[in-house]
Amino acid sequence: MTNEFLHFDRISRERWQQLHRKTTPPLTEEELNSIKSFNDEISLQDVMDIYLPLTNLIQIYKRAKEDLAFSKGIFLQKTLKKQPFIIGVSGSVAVGKSTTSRLLQILLSRTFENAKVELVTTDGFLYPNSVLQEHDLLNRKGFPESYNMELLLNFLDHLKNGQNYQVPVYSHEIYDIVPDQTQTIQVADFVIVEGINVFQNPQNERLYITDFFDFSIYVDAEVENIEKWYLDRFGKLLDLARRDSKNYYHRFTKEPVEDIMKMARNIWKSINLVNLKDYIEPTRNRAELILHKAHNHEIDEIYLKK
């Protein structure tokens, strides 16, 4: 164990799954398949072993937050405004953040009766391609400078104050922000914020994004596994794009597969791997919980901050 994990408790999958009583999964196999990323692997057994104990843990943190707010209100002699419980989910591209986030959205909405759970990805806070091109940043897309961090902080501030907010919508099909389209994030009991940059500190800002989170999760894996998953996903995106001329990846389908996959490997090494090592992975220890995935996508270890 490196020094980075000294303030974490390492918990094996076998030990973790014992922290929740055996029960029926609160979703079906069909529902699970519908929410998983198309290059990801997850089973109902994973839901039972990993995510139901995690939901219990989140319940403990939520109760502690409410107790603190109640006590603080007594001390200040006023009623404090109810705030959503905000969960940050981070990790590399292609590691399975989206699957984790969508699954948590379902589990929380069914664990807490009548709970409203919103999910937003930070892809919507990328600058549009036109802005990135204007500032010669298109090849830095996904790096910290390609995000409108001021807008992201403003969004989180509105969330904390119990206010609705309209966020831009990003499309992987067109590889850009969708013009004139927004997603309204309404006042909710839980808000899950998912993205590679959610633990990063905005430049020249006194506020840290993690200051807004009540709980935070980093989805982790060995670099060689993430690279394989990234290339698998790229290949599947190409297959989908062959049938859709409007898809951003359609332009690549006319080239030999070997050439395109060579390009994908170069993109991984020159962009995604650099971003992971320089900006994403260094934020890992800011998470409250780390879910480590093995080569088969199965979570084999959990690290919980002491």
Curated annotation (Swiss-Prot):
HAMAP family per the UniProt record, alphabetical: Pantothen_kinase_1
Location of this chain's protein in the cell: Cytoplasm
Keyword 4Fe-4S included in the entry's annotation: no
Pfam families per UniProt: PRK
Reaction catalyzed: (R)-pantothenate + ATP = (R)-4'-phosphopantothenate + ADP + H(+)
Annotated metabolic or biological route of this protein: Cofactor biosynthesis; coenzyme A biosynthesis; CoA from (R)-pantothenate: step 1/5
Protein name: Pantothenate kinase
